[in-house]
Amino acid sequence: MSDQSSDPIVEQFRNQITDTDLAILEAINKRITTVRKLHAYKAEQGYDAVDPSREEWLTQYLQRCNKGPLSNDEVAILWRSIIDSTLREVARLREA
């Protein structure tokens, strides 16, 4: 078996993956920033902080928009994780 770390094609794919991962991270951080602003506004207005129907709508919308190769089941799992992480982060920042 050869050393894949010296293979330029492997390195090129890895660099593309890293760039994509950074873009995903930036998008998630942007999402959290926007959700924080929304939660602050909702608090000022006396609205409920969480809207489960909106979360369900978003998941279904993203599944309809999904062109693959990620399965719709995985879209739902991934988005539930992102929503949960966002809510935990917003709660953590509120407590700070």
Question: Predicted regions span which residues?
Answer:
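Domain-level signature for soluble enzymes in the chorismate/prephenate branch of the shikimate pathway
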Residues: 1-96
